From Swiss-Prot:
Cysteine disulfide partners in this protein: none
Alphabetical list of NCBIfam families matching this protein: murC
Short name of one Pfam family: Mur_ligase_C
Organism: Dechloromonas aromatica (strain RCB)
Protein name: UDP-N-acetylmuramate--L-alanine ligase
Catalytic activity: UDP-N-acetyl-alpha-D-muramate + L-alanine + ATP = UDP-N-acetyl-alpha-D-muramoyl-L-alanine + ADP + phosphate + H(+)
Known role: Cell wall formation.
Domain of life: Bacteria
Length: 463
């Protein structure tokens, strides 16, 4: 690529999926520029890595570029995209540029509806502890590295594979992980769940003849597609039928302890302490152990990396204690969860990590389409908390849908009679609402994929 392309411009460079690729390309000595609607901690970090970032979109921003990279969030009427097409500059989807990076290394791609970011981070952490020094591109900030991407000197590139827009079908990894298959982003697949499952079949069948599929054997939808995947398959899960499975699972003060039994020619079992809570994270760790075993990371490195795992930004991220004006304090936790299935897993993890304490949820639904498609499931999972601060929908560019907004969700919750939501019209009011609702000894969990991500930092600043 480098003999033809020297200057690469990213439209929306501050996005989680875009910034990591831009950072790795900058370290590969490409000239990298980018634009975004607003400056952020991410754009400032990129500038520190040598990426020139412009706030705002304008045709002149792409001057000198040999290629322009866009995500699916960038519309065709963006002035930089229009200018690139007029000048015959290639406009490249983000996933296609990630695929080009993966051609330089042996790719490990982690796909699935839930758990991609944490599993990618766990795989990266174990490989790094094992001395492999992987390149990684993650959708969240790996706390141990202080970044969501890094160019490593080793042979492997570890990356998330995104099914939301079917862009994971650009990738050609040598190891593919599928954590689960659930109904989300269904508009991409014409609201046809079988089409979604078929996309995962196509993803796994992109493996070379020597490639390996690491999949969750507990997931019924994954089991359903395996007969259509004529590749080497390694399963993980809680079932004893899985090649890698967990036994003797104990939740202990925000950690998970378990024995990993490996039925793959490796007879030794591993005694694991995972430094993050939740049964869902036991599954994520099993996936990472399976990948690490496949690439011959030592048992000692696997055990050490999981015990010392520092987590991922906005994945059960603990902000510590926040003092209340009237005295006492509450524990503040932040999480990216925005689908009912992953929310239920995170809420269960919170109950396990903080037994006996009142759980307050501050939640901002993400997208009208998801709220419509999962409405009853949202009502069910939101009804399990002790107190609820419910924000209006974060649209993510979507037009409103009748009866799929925040107020409709609040009304349905009141009718259910299990929780009385405090509705927050403007997300800017959420920090004060949390301070008004929280009591001494509470656990306050902020959740959502939209602008609620800025709320915990503001709550933590209250004095």
């Amino acid at each position: 690529m480098k003999h033809k392309v020297k200057h690469i411009h990213f439209v929306g460079v501050g996005g989680s999926g875009m910034s990591g690729i831009a950072e790795v390309l900058a370290h590969l000595d490409f000239t990298v520029t980018g634009s975004d609607l607003a400056a952020s901690a991410t754009t400032r970090r990129l500038e520190g890595e040598g990426v020139k970032v412009t706030v705002g979109h304008a045709a002149e921003n792409i001057a000198g570029a040999d290629a322009v990279v866009i995500s699916t969030a960038v519309k065709a009427d963006n002035p930089e995209v229009i200018a690139a097409r007029e000048r015959k500059i290639p406009v490249v989807p983000r996933a296609q540029m990630l695929a080009e990076l993966m051609r330089l290394k042996s790719g490990i791609a982690i796909a699935g509806t839930h758990g991609k970011t944490t599993t990618t981070s766990l795989v990266t952490s174990i490989l790094a502890e094992g001395g492999i020094d992987p390149t990684f591109v993650i959708g969240g900030r790996l706390n141990a590295a202080g970044a969501n991407a890094r160019l490593g000197s080793g042979d492997f590139l570890v990356a998330e594979a995104d099914e939301s827009d079917a862009s994971f079908l650009f990738l050609s990894p040598v190891i593919s992980v599928v954590t689960n298959i659930d109904a989300d982003h269904m508009e991409t697949y014409g609201h046809d769940f079988e089409r979604l499952k078929s996309a995962f079949v196509d993803f796994l069948n992109r493996l070379p003849f020597y490639g390996v599929a690491v999949v969750c054997g507990d997931d019924a939808n994954i089991r359903d597609i395996l007969p259509r995947v004529p590749k080497q398959i390694i399963t993980y899960g809680l079932s004893n039928e899985c090649n890698f499975h967990a036994e003797n699972i104990v939740a202990d003060n925000g950690q998970m302890r378990f024995d990993c039994v490996r039925v793959n020619g490796t007879t030794s079992r591993l005694s694991i302490t995972l430094n993050t809570p939740g049964m869902h994270n036991v599954l994520n760790a099993l996936a990472a152990i399976a990948v690490a075993t496949e690439v011959q990371v030592s048992d000692a490195a696997i055990v050490k990396a999981l015990a010392e795992f520092k987590g991922v930004g906005r994945r059960f991220q603990r902000y510590g204690e926040v003092a209340l004006p009237a005295g006492g304090s509450f524990t503040l936790v932040d999480d990216y969860g925005h689908h009912p299935v992953e929310m239920a897993a995170t809420l269960a993890a919170a109950r396990g990590a903080f037994p006996g304490r009142r759980l307050v949820l501050a939640f901002q639904p993400h997208r009208y389409t998801r709220t419509r498609d999962c409405f009853e499931d949202f009502v069910k999972v939101l009804s399990t908390v002790d107190a609820l601060c419910l924000a209006e929908i974060y649209a993510a560019g979507e037009a409103p849908i009748v009866a799929a907004d925040g107020r409709s969700l609040a009304r349905a919750l009141r009718v259910s009679g299990k929780v009385e939501p405090v509705f927050v019209e403007d997300i800017a009011a959420m920090p004060q609402t949390i301070m008004d609702v929280a009591r001494d000894g509470d656990v306050v969990l902020c959740m959502g994929a939209g602008s609620i991500g800025a709320v915990p930092g503001k709550v933590a600043e209250f004095k």
